[in-house]
């Protein structure tokens, strides 16, 4: 696998030397880094409720992380279509450990490396692609929750227009770093259903083959429908409402789930969030998520998450940012609860808007959780912030203080 990846990278780099009349090189990326302490004693420990699929991230991230992306247009053909390649390096390292980006506390990998033939007249402006790429990633910014994500290693047709609608298909074998087995997955999407001025619906279906390499495995499927409303309520932001359902391995919803689950395993999810920029200085994002998991082995659980982040700029470059979030998981063993609050004085040299970056933040985070959450952490996440072997011991509350920089660019 390493040898084939190396050959692919060499071919991609070699293609940059081809004689072409016009080659546009684009460099984009994302970086966050910082340092923090838990209650002023020891390295920062982040708060996430066992069973919750995400956490509220402001002042609650415990890693250095970077994505560095290069995209190169190789040829523009006579029909207007474009041949391109794209590669992205990903770097990750936990706080409190030397940033080697390898070993038990860090990683370095190519999380994108693919070729694309875009704007094809034969596909009415659609594209063909092959490789490993980010694709149709739908996420909530304040919790970094990728609820519908078709990123994968495979090939696909992207947004071929037929009439008023755009059709996409992806065949993939692996859709996340944590997926151990290669499993065939098919994703079909149709978009462009106009519902109202500024509003559209996109629908996607995923089918996951039964893998022959996994004992007692099963096939599965999932469906997602999402409505996107531009300029929601005149607040200069978007609203997204997604409804999701899956069975068997399809219970991963946005991802390939456990292939040993049969069709008796089911998951439902509702995602609702919106951005707003009420004035040039006042903006934010609010979210609500509900997920119900039904398992035949008694592992049923319900997850609720409600929260929001708001920023107010006192000057063109100084913001005060606040975030509050609550997660609750109803499962065997009791109802787990976690509430978290963060306040962050922030320098924003590019302006006062909510999404303007870079930001350099000082932050204070306080969280509180109940006994059921602590007992679940003892069992499922020993040594984590909520467990009695973590940074806060037997207490069921704790705080972090630190500094962080976040920056993205295109």
Where in the sequence are the language-model features?
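Beta-barrel outer-membrane channel/assembly domains of diderm bacteria
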Residues: 2, 9, 13-124, 160, ...
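Transmembrane beta-strands of outer-membrane beta-barrel proteins
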Residues: 25-33, 76, 81-89, 126-130, ...
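Transmembrane beta-strands of outer-membrane beta-barrel pores
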Residues: 33-39, 74, 89-95, 132-136, ...
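Surface-exposed coil loops of outer-membrane beta-barrel proteins
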Residues: 34-36, 40-58, 97-111, 122-214, ...
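Solvent-exposed loop segments that connect transmembrane elements
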Residues: 43-51, 179-181, 213-216, 246-263, ...
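Short sequence motifs at beta-strands and strand-loop junctions characteristic
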Residues: 58-64, 104-107, 147-149, 180-182, ...
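Hydrophobic, lipid-facing positions within transmembrane beta-strands of outer-membrane proteins
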Residues: 64-68, 110-113, 151-155, 184-188, ...
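Detector for outer-membrane/organellar transmembrane beta-barrel domains
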Residues: 195-210, 216-331, 337-341, 347
